[in-house]
Amino acid sequence: MIEADRLISAGATIAEEVADRAIRPKLLAEYVGQPQVRSQMEIFIQAAKLRGDALDHLLIFGPPGLGKTTLANIVANEMGVNLRTTSGPVLEKAGDLAAMLTNLEPHDVLFIDEIHRLSPVVEEVLYPAMEDYQLDIMIGEGPAARSIKIDLPPFTLIGATTRAGSLTSPLRDRFGIVQRLEFYQVPDLQHIVGRSARHMGLEMSDDGALEVARRARGTPRIANRLLRRVRDFAEVKHDGAISAEIAAQALDMLNVDAEGFDYMDRKLLLAVIDKFFGGPVGLDNLAAAIGEERETIEDVLEPYLIQQGFLQRTPRGRMATVRAWNHFGITPPEMP
């Protein structure tokens, strides 16, 4: 199974990235959710503007689909500067990064997505650029090689990652601001779905937006994807208006249940409950039971189920929680 093939995958396709640009908030005043991040960034941005300085370098981390790129765009808009965007895998050579840095205007924002995937060679170039606004470049090769320093304008580096633990300490320590994005609460997702529906010209009730939000796994990207599929259903099967009933019908048809679980989530939980009496069950046995690779279970299926309290990892194996039994309307066995 490929994670990107799942309707409830938090990853984005190229088409979705293009479509989402039109409905992204542009300013902090439009930004919904993440109240602590929003209030802190408002102060940091205002302070930098009052001083006439570039904003401190900013690291944004958290699960995929929560709006790290959106926040980077908002920072650039609020600061009134240009945003240059790239990603860790794209910056293969030191010269690739040097070319971007030397083209920055004062106070510009350089956004590096997947910054944990920077090569060590590129990372070494980044250290003096972040700390001293200087670029060290080697000219020539062998014994005749020499280093020259190029002054850079003050700029803000925004790094985004889903794996903050994979960053090296020297890189992580050079960020003056670190923000973690959390999964969104349902009321905030409802607001986001309603806003997206208005941008898309859809007629949608508050209850319809709530139904989509409940099944979006705390993730705006998933919420917007589900909204597009609900729109398709409403236009073909009804008059295009989206109520709670129509949203529920559409999402049930798409095999996304009230908890945001898809077929594979339910298959895993039911395997633990039905085939292994609720567990504990070893990872290899579970992988064989559902016909998936153990890496797929560990990296794709398990994290959300564990976060939401439906599955437990124990030293003896995986166990279904009481909440998982109740989700399927099955009475859990009495604990000894």
Swiss-Prot record:
Q: What is its EC number?
A: 3.6.4.-
Q: Where in the cell is it found?
A: Cytoplasm
Q: What class of enzyme is it?
A: hydrolase
Q: Which GO terms describe its biological process?
A: DNA recombination; DNA repair
SMART domains assigned to the protein according to its UniProt record, in alphabetical order: AAA
- UniProt region (Small ATPAse domain (RuvB-S)), positions on chain: 185-255
> Know anything about its domains from the record?
Has 3 domains, the large (RuvB-L) and small ATPase (RuvB-S) domains and the C-terminal head (RuvB-H) domain. The head domain binds DNA, while the ATPase domains jointly bind ATP, ADP or are empty depending on the state of the subunit in the translocation cycle. During a single DNA translocation step the structure of each domain remains the same, but their relative positions change.
* Described purpose of this protein according to its UniProt entry: The RuvA-RuvB-RuvC complex processes Holliday junction (HJ) DNA during genetic recombination and DNA repair, while the RuvA-RuvB complex plays an important role in the rescue of blocked DNA replication forks via replication fork reversal (RFR). RuvA specifically binds to HJ cruciform DNA, conferring on it an open structure. The RuvB hexamer acts as an ATP-dependent pump, pulling dsDNA into and through the RuvAB complex. RuvB forms 2 homohexamers on either side of HJ DNA bound by 1 or 2 RuvA tetramers; 4 subunits per hexamer contact DNA at a time.
Q: What is this protein called?
A: Holliday junction branch migration complex subunit RuvB
- Recite the lineage of the species: Bacteria, Pseudomonadati, Pseudomonadota, Gammaproteobacteria, Enterobacterales
Q: Which gene encodes it?
A: ruvB
